[in-house]
Amino acid sequence: MPYIIEPFTNVNFKDALLRLRKAHRFLVSRAKATIIGSDFDESRWGSSVKRSPVKLNEGDVPPLIGKTEEKFSEVINIAATVERLMDGIEWFAAQPQNKGYSILECHPSTSDDTRGNDLVIIDRDDRIVIRCEVCDVVSSNADSNRKEKKDIRNLGCNEFVPQDGVTRYICTSLEFAAALASPKRKWGSKPYRYELIETRGSSSTCMLLIQSADNNKNGK
Protein backbone atom coordinates (compact mmCIF):
# COMPACT_ATOMS: atom_id res chain seq x y z
CA MET A 1 0.00 0.00 0.00
CA PRO A 2 1.45 3.40 -0.95
CA TYR A 3 1.87 6.15 1.63
CA ILE A 4 1.72 9.91 1.25
CA ILE A 5 5.41 9.97 2.17
CA GLU A 6 7.10 6.62 1.75
CA PRO A 7 9.38 5.06 4.39
CA PHE A 8 13.11 5.03 3.74
CA THR A 9 16.13 3.33 5.30
CA ASN A 10 19.88 3.55 5.83
CA VAL A 11 20.57 7.26 5.44
CA ASN A 12 22.51 9.90 7.35
CA PHE A 13 20.80 12.75 9.16
CA LYS A 14 21.62 15.35 6.50
CA ASP A 15 20.28 13.35 3.58
CA ALA A 16 17.15 12.39 5.52
CA LEU A 17 16.40 16.05 6.18
CA LEU A 18 16.95 16.95 2.54
CA ARG A 19 14.49 14.27 1.41
CA LEU A 20 11.88 15.20 4.00
CA ARG A 21 12.12 18.93 3.32
CA LYS A 22 11.60 18.36 -0.38
CA ALA A 23 8.56 16.15 0.25
CA HIS A 24 7.18 18.61 2.81
CA ARG A 25 7.53 21.60 0.47
CA PHE A 26 5.69 19.64 -2.20
CA LEU A 27 2.80 18.77 0.13
CA VAL A 28 2.48 22.38 1.23
CA SER A 29 2.47 23.64 -2.36
CA ARG A 30 -0.16 21.12 -3.44
CA ALA A 31 -2.37 21.87 -0.42
CA LYS A 32 -2.15 25.60 -1.14
CA ALA A 33 -3.05 24.99 -4.77
CA THR A 34 -6.10 23.02 -3.67
CA ILE A 35 -7.35 25.88 -1.50
CA ILE A 36 -6.70 28.51 -4.16
CA GLY A 37 -8.50 26.44 -6.77
CA SER A 38 -11.51 25.62 -4.60
CA ASP A 39 -14.91 27.23 -5.08
CA PHE A 40 -17.14 25.74 -2.41
CA ASP A 41 -20.38 27.15 -1.06
CA GLU A 42 -19.61 29.17 2.07
CA SER A 43 -22.27 27.33 4.05
CA ARG A 44 -20.39 24.04 3.51
CA TRP A 45 -16.86 25.41 3.14
CA GLY A 46 -15.26 23.69 6.15
CA SER A 47 -16.61 20.21 5.54
CA SER A 48 -15.97 20.51 1.80
CA VAL A 49 -12.35 21.67 2.07
CA LYS A 50 -11.64 19.01 4.69
CA ARG A 51 -12.60 16.31 2.20
CA SER A 52 -11.25 18.03 -0.90
CA PRO A 53 -8.80 15.83 -2.86
CA VAL A 54 -5.24 17.10 -3.10
CA LYS A 55 -3.56 16.06 -6.35
CA LEU A 56 -0.10 14.65 -5.59
CA ASN A 57 0.82 13.60 -9.12
CA GLU A 58 1.21 17.07 -10.61
CA GLY A 59 4.35 19.16 -10.95
CA ASP A 60 7.82 18.06 -9.85
CA VAL A 61 6.89 15.10 -7.64
CA PRO A 62 9.62 14.17 -5.11
CA PRO A 63 10.69 10.50 -4.94
CA LEU A 64 9.26 10.05 -1.43
CA ILE A 65 5.69 10.89 -2.47
CA GLY A 66 3.84 7.60 -2.79
CA LYS A 67 0.21 8.56 -3.42
CA THR A 68 -1.34 10.32 -6.38
CA GLU A 69 -4.16 11.86 -4.34
CA GLU A 70 -5.19 12.30 -0.71
CA LYS A 71 -7.81 14.19 1.30
CA PHE A 72 -6.84 17.72 2.30
CA SER A 73 -7.20 17.00 6.02
CA GLU A 74 -4.82 14.04 5.83
CA VAL A 75 -2.23 16.03 3.88
CA ILE A 76 -2.31 18.67 6.62
CA ASN A 77 -1.89 16.01 9.31
CA ILE A 78 1.10 14.45 7.57
CA ALA A 79 2.71 17.83 6.89
CA ALA A 80 2.45 18.71 10.60
CA THR A 81 3.85 15.34 11.66
CA VAL A 82 6.77 15.66 9.24
CA GLU A 83 7.55 19.09 10.68
CA ARG A 84 7.88 17.46 14.12
CA LEU A 85 9.91 14.64 12.60
CA MET A 86 12.37 17.05 10.99
CA ASP A 87 12.73 18.95 14.27
CA GLY A 88 13.45 15.66 16.01
CA ILE A 89 16.07 14.59 13.48
CA GLU A 90 17.76 17.99 13.72
CA TRP A 91 17.84 17.66 17.51
CA PHE A 92 19.29 14.14 17.42
CA ALA A 93 21.91 15.24 14.88
CA ALA A 94 22.97 18.15 17.11
CA GLN A 95 23.66 16.01 20.19
CA PRO A 96 27.44 15.45 20.61
CA GLN A 97 26.96 11.87 21.79
CA ASN A 98 25.21 11.03 18.51
CA LYS A 99 28.20 11.83 16.30
CA GLY A 100 28.52 9.16 13.63
CA TYR A 101 24.97 7.90 14.16
CA SER A 102 22.62 7.39 11.22
CA ILE A 103 19.01 6.52 10.48
CA LEU A 104 18.16 2.86 10.03
CA GLU A 105 14.43 3.41 9.46
CA CYS A 106 12.23 6.44 8.94
CA HIS A 107 8.45 6.09 8.59
CA PRO A 108 6.95 9.56 8.05
CA SER A 109 3.43 8.33 7.27
CA THR A 110 3.02 5.03 9.09
CA SER A 111 1.87 6.13 12.53
CA ASP A 112 0.82 3.40 14.98
CA ASP A 113 2.50 0.66 12.96
CA THR A 114 3.41 -2.06 15.47
CA ARG A 115 5.99 -3.49 13.05
CA GLY A 116 8.41 -0.65 13.68
CA ASN A 117 8.91 2.90 14.90
CA ASP A 118 8.66 6.24 13.18
CA LEU A 119 12.40 6.76 13.59
CA VAL A 120 15.11 4.20 14.38
CA ILE A 121 18.72 5.35 14.80
CA ILE A 122 21.87 3.23 14.84
CA ASP A 123 25.44 3.85 15.99
CA ARG A 124 28.66 3.35 14.04
CA ASP A 125 28.56 -0.38 14.77
CA ASP A 126 25.03 -0.68 13.32
CA ARG A 127 23.48 -1.24 16.75
CA ILE A 128 20.06 0.26 17.36
CA VAL A 129 20.50 2.97 19.99
CA ILE A 130 17.41 5.19 19.63
CA ARG A 131 13.74 4.54 18.91
CA CYS A 132 11.32 7.42 18.51
CA GLU A 133 7.61 7.89 17.86
CA VAL A 134 6.50 11.19 16.33
CA CYS A 135 3.15 12.97 16.52
CA ASP A 136 1.62 16.43 16.32
CA VAL A 137 -1.25 16.43 18.80
CA VAL A 138 -3.19 19.68 19.21
CA SER A 139 -4.24 19.06 22.80
CA SER A 140 -3.18 19.64 26.39
CA ASN A 141 -5.05 16.50 27.43
CA ALA A 142 -2.79 13.52 28.08
CA ASP A 143 -5.52 11.09 27.04
CA SER A 144 -6.19 12.75 23.68
CA ASN A 145 -6.92 10.18 20.93
CA ARG A 146 -5.26 7.48 23.08
CA LYS A 147 -2.12 8.52 21.20
CA GLU A 148 0.20 8.06 24.17
CA LYS A 149 -0.99 4.50 24.72
CA LYS A 150 -0.28 3.63 21.09
CA ASP A 151 3.18 5.20 21.11
CA ILE A 152 4.15 3.59 24.41
CA ARG A 153 3.04 0.22 23.05
CA ASN A 154 5.01 0.68 19.84
CA LEU A 155 8.10 1.57 21.86
CA GLY A 156 7.70 -1.56 23.97
CA CYS A 157 7.16 0.29 27.26
CA ASN A 158 3.56 -0.60 28.08
CA GLU A 159 4.55 -3.15 30.74
CA PHE A 160 8.09 -2.02 31.60
CA VAL A 161 10.82 0.17 30.13
CA PRO A 162 13.37 -2.19 28.54
CA GLN A 163 16.91 -1.90 29.87
CA ASP A 164 18.50 -2.85 26.56
CA GLY A 165 20.76 0.10 25.84
CA VAL A 166 18.19 1.72 23.55
CA THR A 167 16.86 5.16 24.47
CA ARG A 168 13.23 5.79 23.61
CA TYR A 169 11.52 9.08 22.85
CA ILE A 170 8.22 10.60 21.86
CA CYS A 171 8.66 13.68 19.66
CA THR A 172 5.60 15.93 19.83
CA SER A 173 4.11 19.38 20.36
CA LEU A 174 4.87 21.43 23.47
CA GLU A 175 1.28 21.40 24.74
CA PHE A 176 0.93 17.62 24.44
CA ALA A 177 4.41 16.98 25.84
CA ALA A 178 3.67 19.15 28.88
CA ALA A 179 0.44 17.25 29.51
CA LEU A 180 2.14 13.87 29.23
CA ALA A 181 5.05 14.79 31.50
CA SER A 182 3.03 16.67 34.11
CA PRO A 183 3.75 15.54 37.70
CA LYS A 184 0.05 16.23 38.39
CA ARG A 185 -1.01 13.29 36.24
CA LYS A 186 -2.53 10.24 37.85
CA TRP A 187 0.51 8.09 37.20
CA GLY A 188 -0.76 5.12 39.18
CA SER A 189 1.08 1.96 38.19
CA LYS A 190 2.43 3.28 34.89
CA PRO A 191 5.93 1.75 34.50
CA TYR A 192 7.37 4.86 32.82
CA ARG A 193 7.98 8.55 33.41
CA TYR A 194 9.13 11.32 31.07
CA GLU A 195 11.92 13.84 30.95
CA LEU A 196 10.72 16.78 28.83
CA ILE A 197 13.38 18.29 26.58
CA GLU A 198 12.66 21.38 24.47
CA THR A 199 14.36 21.35 21.08
CA ARG A 200 14.38 25.17 20.93
CA GLY A 201 12.99 24.96 17.42
CA SER A 202 10.68 27.61 16.02
CA SER A 203 7.70 25.23 16.17
CA SER A 204 8.00 24.39 19.90
CA THR A 205 8.71 20.72 19.30
CA CYS A 206 9.63 18.73 22.40
CA MET A 207 11.34 15.43 23.02
CA LEU A 208 10.04 13.18 25.78
CA LEU A 209 12.73 10.83 27.02
CA ILE A 210 11.07 7.72 28.42
CA GLN A 211 12.50 6.47 31.69
CA SER A 212 11.63 3.67 34.07
CA ALA A 213 9.40 4.78 36.93
CA ASP A 214 11.78 2.96 39.27
CA ASN A 215 14.70 5.15 38.22
CA ASN A 216 12.95 8.49 37.69
CA LYS A 217 13.00 11.07 40.46
CA ASN A 218 10.69 13.60 38.77
CA GLY A 219 7.04 13.11 39.59
CA LYS A 220 5.11 10.25 41.12
Residue ranges and their predicted role:
Residues 1-24, 134, 157, 175-187, ...:
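Mixed-charge (Asp/Glu-Lys/Arg
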Residues 1-56:
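Nuclease-adjacent, charged terminal/linker segments that flank catalytic cores
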Residues 27, 88-97, 155-159, 183-187:
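Hydrophobic, Leu/Ile/Phe/Ala-enriched alpha-helical segments that form helix-helix packing faces
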Residues 57-107:
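Acidic-basic catalytic patches of nuclease active cores, encompassing PD-(D/E)XK
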Residues 101-125:
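Active-site metal-binding core of divalent-cation-utilizing nuclease and nuclease-like domains
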Residues 119-141:
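Conserved catalytic cores of phosphodiester-cleaving nucleases, focusing on short active-site segments
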Residues 134-191:
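Catalytic cores of nucleic-acid endonucleases
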Residues 170-220:
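Domain-level recognition of nuclease-like catalytic cores that cleave nucleotide substrates
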